[in-house]
Amino acid sequence: MFVAKNLSPERESKRQKKEPEIMEPSFPLLSPNNCGHWYIRYGFCIVCKSTVDKTIEGRVFDGLHLSSEALALTKRLITKFSCLNMKKLHLVLDLDLTLIHSVRVPCLSEAEKYLIEEAGSTTREDLWKMKVRGDPISITIEHLVKLRPFLCEFLKEANEMFTMYVYTKGTRPYAEAILKLIDPKKLYFGHRVITRNESPHTKTLDMVLADERGVVIVDDTRKAWPNNKSNLVLIGRYNYFRSQSRVLKPHSEEKTDESENNGGLANVLKLLKGIHHKFFKVEEEVESQDVRLTMSVVENFSSEPKAKRRKIEPTINESSSSLSSSSSCGHWYICHGICIGCKSTVKKSQGRAFDYIFDGLQLSHEAVALTKCFTTKLSCLNEKKLHLVLDLDHTLLHTVMVPSLSQAEKYLIEEAGSATRDDLWKIKAVGDPMEFLTKLRPFLRDFLKEANEFFTMYVYTKGSRVYAKQVLELIDPKKLYFGDRVITKTESPHMKTLDFVLAEERGVVIVDDTRNVWPDHKSNLVDISKYSYFRLKGQDSMPYSEEKTDESESEGGLANVLKLLKEVHQRFFRVEEELESKDVRSLLQEIDFELNVESVE
């Protein structure tokens, strides 16, 4: 049983367990007659609720059918979010002969059979046995799988720059068995796995939810990508075991292997870093960048030394959203007042501004609801992540103006930013004479690192954007945790609301020290004790700063909240088949109810 005391200082001693009221999104502007049926789930349009012909053009993603228009706009929006929020491109990786080499055990040569004993032993972390269901499924096939040298380092480093997909011509059971070896926690690929079950013929980026201008492919076979060669980085084929036509001895029989430092994956990683650097070199030009052009001017971008490539000007297909006319378009996605779909001018009153994501973005009310739905679905299924909204002041840190320090606190001015203090900093805005001291709450860095494994995180503060930016340069300088998901009083000057968070409320947890700033979302809220390090106005007791003490690292507010967040996450994802019916609000009430019962007992 999970136990965490005093997580919510405002919790009532007895509380009835009740289900939160869940508001279904409504779309009053559209009827079956004027709806484009962009988002269809199991044969029903999500927007107008009518039955839709299954033959409508588009793509299916685990029961969710996107029309051609919806697919084009979703790809464009995901790429914008990825580039501007996370500074990530998309990377599509082949499996066989690119990341690994597998062979059926009966096909091993006599000279290779020693590997059967070595597979999975303490001496070999790169060689594994696996059993895969065959066709028919009553047949089980045993394979040996050899990981390509440098694979673990490659995935770890590439993950910092790219959202990654696996795309294989193998079966889904085979791909899942491989991924249990190379990505058991689904940190790198989530559920972004495309197999011959979904794509039985040639490979295509139509299956990848991102604009082609932001997608790089790494594959050992050029002809598998007839329509996307300009996105392709060829990698030298990795053959570890003996193949039927091979004359020379393979690595397996020679007991050697490809070079770790100068092999295929190491060379491709250097290239990917160059592409990423060039793409994001000028932040103002990111929206006009195209990896296909970037790749064509990066020297030696093929890892095959004999490959020669001419500079390719990619053919960029206009989105099929151009089929929409201004009269039939719902104006769902707007940029600087211009509808992305029909290119007509749209009034600001027709949607909500999301400038914090990227300047000029406006979404209609229908687009907000559907984007939230789609984001939550992708986050839950692909990454096994929920969304977490964090307050700054008195939750993650405490900031005070330097002139407000008491006499007994002034020693801190010298300590701030020194080698002895990595939790205390001076901050000062450009052009502002006022100087501040910011004290990070104990356990903050560990909290962010661990929470990032389970949640996509936002900062939501009543401070200014300038202030938030300065604080985030201290706690997240590389934008690993929050990206640009930062909401301030500039966007939300009154009460705080989840309307600005692009995720369904059923998958969002809020951590804040002030309950009354969330009038409409208390059921999503985890109260955290207020962190006050410096002396407050009117405070009688001595603060931590004057006592030269601090909140407990292991038993303080953030440590306790992290335990609760892990419990919520564990319960949410406990049964994968029930994900779409799970709701963090019910889980928070359930946990709180259990804690109340325990405290009474």
Swiss-Prot record:
- Enzyme Commission identifier(s): 3.1.3.16
Looking at the keywords, is tRNA-binding present?
A: no
Which reaction equation describes what this protein catalyses? O-phospho-L-seryl-[protein] + H2O = L-seryl-[protein] + phosphate; O-phospho-L-threonyl-[protein] + H2O = L-threonyl-[protein] + phosphate
Question: What does the entry give for GO biological process?
Answer: abscisic acid-activated signaling pathway; response to abscisic acid; response to cold; response to salt; response to water deprivation
Induction details: Induced transiently by abscisic acid (ABA), salt (NaCl), cold and drought.
Q: In which tissues is it expressed?
A: Expressed in roots, seedlings, hypocotyls, cotyledons, leaves, siliques and flowers.
**A Pfam family:** NIF
| Region annotation (Disordered) ranges | 1-20
Q: Which UniProt keywords apply?
A: Abscisic acid signaling pathway, Activator, Hydrolase, Nucleus, Stress response, Transcription, Transcription regulation
Transcription: present as a keyword of the record? yes
Q: Which GO terms describe its molecular function?
A: RNA polymerase II CTD heptapeptide repeat phosphatase activity
- Occurrences of domain FCP1 homology (ranges): 84-259, 381-553
Q: Which InterPro entries match?
A: Fcp1 (IPR039189), FCP1_dom (IPR004274), FCP1_euk (IPR011947), HAD-like_sf (IPR036412), HAD_sf (IPR023214)
Q: Where is the composition biased (Basic and acidic residues)?
A: 8-20
Q: Where in the cell is it found?
A: Nucleus
Following inactivation of the gene, the phenotype reported is: Weak abscisic acid (ABA) hyposensitivity during the early stages of seedling development. Slighty decreased drought stress tolerance.
CC per GO annotation? nucleus
Indicate the principal place this protein occupies in or around the cell: nucleus
* PANTHER family noted in UniProt: RNA POLYMERASE II C-TERMINAL DOMAIN PHOSPHATASE-LIKE-RELATED, RNA POLYMERASE II CTD PHOSPHATASE
NCBIfam families attached here? FCP1_euk (TIGR02250)
This molecule's function is given as: Mediates the dephosphorylation of 'Ser-2' of the heptad repeats YSPTSPS in the C-terminal domain of the largest RNA polymerase II subunit (RPB1). This promotes the activity of RNA polymerase II. Positively regulates abscisic acid (ABA) and drought responses, including the regulation of specific genes expression.
Q: What is the protein named?
A: RNA polymerase II C-terminal domain phosphatase-like 5
Q: Which organism is it from?
A: Arabidopsis thaliana
